[in-house]
């Protein structure tokens, strides 16, 4: 009796000259819907959790544009009818997990029946010598509720600042076409 992943998709820009975050997210969402055998109109909530967009665009909300592009219940829903609510969730690396938590709660309460989470990131366009080059990527997941499976049932997060000195992270860089990129 929990939230389950109905389908998932992930893709890269496949060599597009100037990939656009919106188009990558559109493609990931459409692929994910196809994997699940669902229609865009089946989606009750669409959350975009991507961070890096071309030209560092912040407005309008990318989720609303993706909703429009894939055709998920456009316009105002009729009174008592079905619609899709969409919004951007900017929570860094935790964005997708936070989106799962939000949609799981709404699935558990019966407010939504199918949730979609998309994320796409492209280089925001601040290329200069030594800049990190992001590989344009996108992903999408569809969440539903299943009475037979445990799925996602509880979420809990906690931070322990007294242990922050135990965390270490790093990247190995290499030169490629005049830019430093992660190996």
Protein language model annotation of sequence segments:
Residues 1-51, 55-58, 64-75, 145-183:
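Conserved "HGTGT" condensation-loop signature of ketosynthase/thiolase-family condensing enzymes
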Residues 120, 131-134:
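Hydrophobic alpha-helical segments and helix pairs
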Residues 138-143:
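Short beta-strand scaffold segments in enzyme catalytic cores
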Residues 115-121:
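Short beta-strand segments
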Residues 46-48, 85-90, 118:
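Extended hydrophobic secondary-structure segments that form protein cores and membrane-embedded regions
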Residues 22, 93, 132:
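Short-chain dehydrogenase/reductase
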Residues 53-113:
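Conserved catalytic cysteine-centered active-site region
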Residues 104-106, 127-132:
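A generic local secondary-structure boundary/capping motif
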């Amino acid at each position: 009796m929990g939230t389950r992943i109905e389908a998932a998709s992930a893709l890269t820009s496949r060599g597009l000259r100037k990939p656009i975050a919106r188009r990558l997210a559109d493609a990931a969402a459409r692929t994910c819907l196809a994997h699940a055998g669902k229609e865009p109109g089946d989606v009750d909530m669409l959350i975009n959790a991507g961070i890096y967009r071309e030209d560092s665009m912040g407005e309008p909300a990318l989720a609303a544009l993706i909703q429009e592009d894939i055709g998920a219940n456009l316009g105002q829903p009729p009174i008592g009818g079905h619609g899709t609510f969409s919004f951007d969730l900017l929570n860094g690396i935790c964005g997708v997990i936070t989106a799962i938590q939000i949609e799981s709660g709404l699935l558990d309460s019966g407010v939504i029946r199918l949730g979609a989470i998309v994320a796409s990131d492209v280089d925001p366009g601040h290329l200069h010598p030594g800049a990190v080059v992001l590989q344009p990527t996108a992903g999408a997941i569809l969440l539903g509720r299943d009475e037979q499976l445990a799925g996602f049932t509880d979420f809990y997060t906690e931070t322990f600042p007294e242990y922050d000195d135990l965390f270490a992270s790093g990247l190995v860089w290499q030169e490629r076409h005049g830019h430093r990129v992660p190996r």
